[in-house]
Structure formats: structure tokens, C-alpha cells
Amino acid sequence: MTNQQEQHIAIFTTASIPWLTGTAVNPLFRAAYLANDGERRVTLVIPWLTLKHQKLVYPNSITFSSPSEQEAYVRQWLEERVSFRLAFEIRFYPGKFAIDKRSILPVGDISDAIPDEEADIAVLEEPEHLTWFHHGQKWKTKFNYVIGIVHTNYLEYVKREKQGRVKAFFLKYLNSWVVGIYCHKVIRLSAATQEYPKSIVCNVHGVNPKFLEIGLRKLEQQKLQEQPFTKGAYYIGKMVWSKGYKELLKLLEKHQKELAELEVDLYGDGEDSEEIKEAARKLDLTVNVYPGRDHADSLFHNYKVFLNPSTTDVVCTTTAEALAMGKIVVCANHISNKFFKQFPNCRTYDDGQGFVRATLKALGEQPSQLTEQQRHELSWEAATQRFIKVSDLNRLSRADSNLSKRSVFASSSISVGKNLEDMSAYIHFLASGFEASRTAFGAIPGSLQPDEELCRDLGLSLNTPSPNTRKQD
């Protein structure tokens, strides 16, 4: 550890504000709440993109000329959503946006963002994503303890592509390989994710406090016998077919007669928006399609029912937000929604007729009033408590002496399993060190080392890999 009293937790993630995706928002809140009690030092490590790549990713033409400018933007965004002083650091690693994958991939050895002498505990948000093409020091060697948090059901997305089942077969083993090499502990947000050896399923995410505040205002209206919800049903999500729109429009099309009086509003932006609008227009039902908005926008406060048939999410953020706002949620009876079943306003269905019954029943009654404990379960305070418990952070902090790679893992270092793991890690190191093999497996060309522009923006030396990058210990 950096000192005997304080853990240093470095949280690495695959996206950053202003991109309002789950891996940008949730690790940001995690960093804030982990650092809030002052018992540990926390550093959030996020990708830096060159101007060209920023324009491909960030909404509303938002761009940054320097990492410090983006850091200021990120901090301001978070300060508007929490009520306490932010006590964590922000650092950047070089990244590039992969258009075909619609995601940011690391460039070079991103573990270099944390100096060796500061390396203690690493949290890899989307560990498979961060390590597919990792070429540098082994994460378990550099850090005393590495925790992976699995956010995304990559196999489900890949299965929807051409030759999807074949791709998913190989991706499953690639994910298991890299996560096993680089993580001591794996937390899966729900059982909808790929299974990993020695992993634990726990939802360690909470909701933006703004949604709980909205829910409290609605609760007060209910207590005063006022009408808190004056609108009907809606759905909000990135407008791509795989994000629940395909399932929702199929259900609406098949059951138009039973749902003849239903009016649904859809909100979102995305690559499939025109196709989705066209499909909605063909229905006899009234289905309105609008551009995406922040879910906390006052526009959404008065909707009573949130329809979410998506089964590709691991734990759907918008479902949690809708419940926090006091709404009724109608969602599929799917393992990704298991966490939400504890709330009385969560209504699940197994088939089309079940969807019709649940939707009509939800529209015809008032939502149950959430208890204080139920609201707490949705909060980031509760999510942080769950994370600390399942990741064993308190057990680590109570150790009689500092963690060390040698003392904690000495018994396994001489085992056959450890030797095989080291050999496996070395094979991955070799394979990820050649441009041809990297690109063959889907890496962005030229991502082995940061280019001149990334180096200039981040103050790195061009074509001078650090010792960590040159050597896989």
C-alpha cells in the first residue's frame, strides 16, 4: 500500500462524460462515493480521445482541447448531482474510438497512468474490454489486488451479428482467458453476464441522487392525495434495435387490438432511429418518437409507466431510475431484472399476453409508495456498501500489515496453477505485441502505442514505451 492507513483504489473505465453511457456514469459515481468517507484514496482513470475521435463520440458537438478542460467538465457535471465535496483524483489514459464496435479501446499500456509506487488496488470496469489488447505489465503483478466489474453482456450483442453464434463462441473463451489472467476478483452486475470462475453476482450500481429526489416529491404529492402522474407509458434508451426497441415494437404490433387505447412515447437517439420511426408509423397504435433527453428532465416526471422489454442490458440503469422516481416498471421476467423484483412497482411478464395484462393493469392503478429502505436500496450509498462487502475491501484494510503481492499470494505462486497462469499471461503479452495479430483479433490499427497527437495531449514521450510497456513481469 501507499501507506499503512490508506488504501489507494484506481478505477479504470472505458468511457467518460459527456458520453452518457453506463461505463462513463457509474464508475464516476463509484469513485465519488468510495472517496466520500475519507478512508481511502481514490483515482478515476478515464480515456482521453483526440479531437477527431471526440467528434465521433461526444454528443451536441462537445469537444475538449485538453485533459484538464475535460476534467473540469466531468467534475462540474458530477457536482450538480451530488451534495458533497468531491475527494477523488482524475487521470487519463490514451484511447481511440472504434467505429465498428461503437466503443473506446485503450491505446498502449494504460496501467502506466498509475505510477508503480502508487499501485495498490485496481478496479477494472469492463475488465474484458480493458484487457483484450493489453500489452504491458501484468495487472496482477503491478497491483496488489485487481477487481473486475462486468457491465456488459457482450455475448448477447455478438449473437445478433452475422455469424453471431460462431463469434460468441470464440469471444466467450477470449473473455474468460483475459479476465482470468488479470483479475483476482470478478463482480458480475447480474447473472445476465457471462459466467467466470470464482465470480460473484451483485448489483454494485446505484442511481443518480436526482432521481431519488424526484421520487420523494412524487411521494409527497401522493400523501397529499394529489395526482402525481398525469401521463401514460414511455420508453427511453439509445435508439438501436438491440436496446429493446425490437422487442417493444414486436409486442405492440402483435397485440394492437388488446392495446388499442394505449399511447406510447419513445425517446432516444441512435443509428437505427429512422428505421424505428418508420416501424412505429406502420402501427395502428399511437406511438410517438422523440429525440433523446436526460431521464431526469422534467418532461419525464409525470409519466406513470415505464415499458422496458430489453433483455440485452445487464442491469438496466433507466429501469432503476424509473423506480427511483416512483413509477411502475413493466419489464421482462429475465435474469437481468432480478434485482428489481424486490420493488413493488416492478411488474414482470413472461410472454405477449403477460405484457398486455401487466401494461393495462399498471395504467389503471397508482404506483405503490416506496419505503425509506426501498429508496436506500436504489441509492449509491447502498451500492457502495455492497461493493465494499463483496470486493472484500474492508477485510483487506484490516490486514495486520500492508498487502503485498508476495505475502498474500505466495502460497499460489509456487503452484502449478500459478505457473500456468503466468505462462498464459506471457502468451497473451506476445500475441498483443504484434500489429498483425492485434488487428486480426479486432484491435484498432496503430493502437499498440499512442500516436503523436495523443502523446502531445497527455504529455507522453512519443515512441518511448515505459519500462512497464516494454517488459511483462
From Swiss-Prot:
Catalysed transformations (reactions): a 1,2-diacyl-3-O-(beta-D-galactosyl)-sn-glycerol + UDP-alpha-D-galactose = a 1,2-diacyl-3-O-[alpha-D-galactosyl-(1->6)-beta-D-galactosyl]-sn-glycerol + UDP + H(+)
Summary of activators and inhibitors of this protein: Stimulated by anionic phospholipids.
Domain of life: Eukaryota
Documented EC number(s): 2.4.1.241
Residue numbers spanned by region Interaction with the membrane lipid bilayer: 130-148, 227-245
Gene Ontology CC, one term: chloroplast outer membrane
Effect seen on changing residue 313 to A: Abolishes catalytic activity
Induction: 30-fold up-regulation by phosphate deficiency.
Entry-linked Gene3D superfamilies: Glycogen Phosphorylase B
Main location: plastid
Job description of the protein: Involved in the synthesis of diacylglycerol galactolipids that are specifically found in thylakoid membranes. Specific for alpha-glycosidic linkages. During phosphate shortage, involved in the biosynthesis of digalactosyldiacylglycerol (DGDG) which rescues the limitation of phospholipids.
Protein name: Digalactosyldiacylglycerol synthase 2, chloroplastic
Protein species of origin: Arabidopsis thaliana
Name of the gene this protein is made from: DGD2
